[in-house]
From Swiss-Prot:
Residues 1-126 form the Peptidase C39 domain. Residues 469-704 form the ABC transporter domain. Pfam families: ABC_membrane, ABC_tran, Peptidase_C39. It comes from the Bacteria. This is Leukotoxin translocation ATP-binding protein LktB. It comes from Mannheimia haemolytica. Belongs to the ABC transporter superfamily. Protein-1 exporter (TC 3.A.1.109) family. Residues 155-437 form the ABC transmembrane type-1 domain.
Length: 708
């Protein structure tokens, strides 16, 4: 009745779903009590106030259909008749609109005509304050500005060194002019000796300062690189589990590897070339003093470089995008193949996998070749402009010398100065491909760094867990357009109770425990531990006090002791051994040559499946968690290993709340209570013998199947 009543107020339903989308928990009845004073549903004003009370930024706007693709989605389409719905995505290519029908509780795809018929031009845009902060801190090229400010002293020193280098670069052509126009004409050997010594000193200082500048600059950029690498890894581990479930491992790895491109760019010559280019204005002034005509030729060539770059850059960027996509596909396929090597060999499908790899590799090499060809065309275009300018300057300069407007020394000095101006431009043009690649890398890396993390700040860190668990009116789906996984689930688990959860595959058993670990927030309802809403709790505080053992557990490439004591490397050995004994792992560990110092190999490859599982159980027990979850934890064990664990189960469960998820009913038959789930709902609950008395029940049916 309560759900139907809430469904009648589509504004409240929309607010609940949008809050859940932004990882904010709410109690619909509390919102209704505070803001729906007349009982007729939330008005536009009360809806905006309710959103504000939840720390959501909501804005009512009027928008034409042709401009809907520009707004941040999902958004609420407000209807004066109360038939509100959510706009999730706009497909401009096919003129289709992905919406969510709040009344029917289902996603819908509307055509242009269908959408126009129900759209009244009113939208409510919703963002969370956390997402606004995330947008302000968006990772792009502006991310490096605070880093430059942080190391401004070092960059100032680099700037000062660059000034001296430019002064030396300015003096050298003047020496050559004096030699040509004065020394050679007047045969002044003493003057020549002085100039030669002075030039040698200038060259030595120039080499030393140039090396010093490169060292200081590389040192600074390396520190920025370390900061970026550390920030990236911390951010990656802080992302919600849904981020990883929706992306291929290889794609994520490929994006992280883009850090290498940024590193090479920062520590290369590109930024020092920019500094050199800034000082070109001084050289232009000196060159203008020598010959305005020749200077105009040099100035006239600069737009040619710029126009050529503008022409080539968009094409190059598109091809770099394609190259990255092919590289990411290869990375993902390689990771998938290595991970599934046992299956590939067992099914003898290596030829098919090799054929797929060859095709993907050929596609990558082809896209890489197109990038190389285009980059070569770009560089040769720059060389063509440079050579053309050199020929024009030679012809015009010779005419000026012949007419007496310019001396030979001045012409040589001018050409040397023009080289100092053009060289940074040439280097930047040749490094343009690197800059484009870095732009792609920043965008790809930004997909990781700009993804919202799990929110820890402002969450409650509560006292030690006792173990009371409550699921109230839980409704959950993994995506807005996905089917409902849990529907109106209500479950109370008392402190110290051992609960078994059984049911067919896909009935929602594991999803229930994911909500308990706060990997997700329910679309509707609350998950409480000791009366505290987990939506308001610090996830780290919660997960440190819950032990979890899955069917397929991952061990790190470390020693057995380090794997068991993963959460506390300084843990006393006695605690490690005690947990291993509880898990039935101590005996086989003691038989190993290195004992607890045995390296298990990547993902525990050096151990059998049963041994890996027992170490994982010991890892879950070592922190003495008040809540323990076994999610098909014993299904992969041999009967002897399972027997050892089941013998210790009473001691394992002592003083804890335990949730056992199993397909084998023998695993849960001694539980205090057994919960039977079907299609996201609890259909039966009771003790083993009580459930068997209902011959028409699902539990009795599953039990009979296993007996047969």
């Amino acid at each position: 009745m309560e759900a139907n009543h809430q469904r009648n107020d589509l504004g409240l339903v929309a607010l609940t779903m949008l809050a859940q989308y932004h990882n904010i928990s709410l109690n619909p009845e509390e919102i209704k009590h505070k803001f729906d004073l007349d009982g007729k549903g939330l008005s536009l004003t009360s809806w905006l106030l309710a959103a504000k009370s939840l720390a959501l930024k909501a804005k009512h706007i009027k928008k034409e259909i042709s401009r809907l693709h520009l707004v941040n989605l999902p958004a609420l389409v407000w209807q004066d008749n109360g038939k509100h719905f959510l706009l999730v995505k706009v497909d401009t290519d096919n003129n289709r609109y992905l919406t969510y029908n709040l009344e029917q509780d289902a996603p819908q795809i509307l055509s242009q005509d269908e959408f126009e018929a129900c759209y009244q031009g009113q939208l409510i845009l919703v963002t969370s304050r956390a997402s606004v902060v995330g947008q302000l801190a968006k990772f792009d090229f502006t991310w490096f500005i605070p880093a430059v400010i942080k190391y401004r002293k070092i960059f100032l020193e680099t700037l000062i060194v660059s000034i001296f280098l430019q002064i030396f670069a300015l003096i050298t052509p003047l020496f050559f002019q004096v030699v040509m126009d004065k020394v050679l004409v007047h045969r002044g050997f003493s003057t020549l000796n002085i100039i030669t010594v002075a030039l040698a000193i200038v060259i030595i200082f120039e080499i030393v300062l140039s090396g010093l500048r490169t060292y200081v600059f590389s040192h600074s950029t390396s520190r920025i690189d370390v900061e970026l690498g550390a920030k990236l890894f911390r951010h990656l581990l802080s992302l919600p589990i849904s981020y990883f479930e929706n992306r291929r491992v290889g794609d994520t790895v490929a994006r992280v590897r883009e850090l290498d491109q940024i590193r090479n760019f920062l520590t290369g010559q590109a930024l020092t070339s920019v500094l050199d280019l800034l000082f070109s204005f001084i050289f232009f002034a000196v060159m203008w003093y020598y010959s305005p005509k020749l200077t105009l030729v040099i100035l006239g060539s600069l737009p040619c470089y710029i126009l050529w770059s503008i022409f080539i850059s968009p094409i190059l960027r598109r091809r770099l995008d394609e190259k990255f996509a092919r590289s990411a596909d290869n990375q993902a396929f390689l990771v998938e193949s290595v991970t599934a090597i046992n299956m590939i060999k067992a099914m003898a499908v290596a030829p098919q996998m090799t054929d797929t790899w060859d095709k993907q590799l050929a596609s990558y090499v082809s896209s890489s070749f197109r990038v190389t060809v285009l980059a070569t065309i770009g560089q040769q275009g720059v060389q063509l402009i440079q050579k053309t300018v050199m020929v024009i300057n030679l012809w015009l300069g010779a005419h000026l010398v012949i007419s007496g407007d310019l001396s030979i020394g001045q012409l040589i000095a001018f050409n040397m100065l023009s080289g100092q101006v053009i060289a940074p431009v040439i280097r930047l043009a040749q490094l343009w491909q690197d800059f484009q690649q870095v732009g792609i890398s920043v965008t790809r890396l930004g997909d990781v760094l700009n993804s919202p993390t799990e929110q820890y700040q402002g969450k409650l860190s509560l006292p030690e867990i006792k173990g009371d668990i409550s699921f109230k009116n839980i409704r959950f789906r993994y995506k807005p357009d996905a089917p409902t996984i849990l529907n109106n689930v209500n479950l109370e688990i008392r402190q110290g109770e051992v609960i078994g959860i059984v049911g067919r595959s896909g009935s929602g058993k594991s999803t229930l425990t994911k909500l308990l670990q706060r990997f997700y927030i329910p679309e509707n309802g609350q998950v409480l531990i000791d009366g505290h809403d987990l939506a308001l709790a610090d996830p780290n505080w919660l997960r440190r006090q819950i032990g979890v053992v899955l069917q397929d557990n991952v061990l790190l490439n470390r020693s057995i002791r380090e794997n068991i004591a993963l959460s506390d490397p300084g843990m006393p050995m006695e605690r490690v051994i005690y947990a291993a004994k509880l898990a039935g792992a101590h005996d086989f560990i003691s038989e190993l040559r290195e004992g607890y110092n045995t390296i298990v190999g990547e993902q525990g490859a050096g151990l059998s499946g049963g041994q890996r599982q027992r170490i994982a159980i010991a890892r879950a027990l070592v922190n003495n968690p008040k809540i323990l979850i076994f999610d098909e934890a014993t299904s992969a064990l041999d009967y002897e290993s399972e027997h050892i664990i089941m013998q210790n189960m009473q001691k394992i469960c002592q003083g804890r709340t335990v949730i056992l998820i199993a397909h084998r009913l023998s695993t849960v038959k001694n539980a205090d209570r057994i919960i039977v789930m079907e299609k996201g709902e609890i259909v039966e609950q009771g003790k083993h013998h009580e459930l068997l008395q209902n011959s028409n029940g699902l539990y009795s049916y599953l039990h009979q199947l296993q007996l047969n």
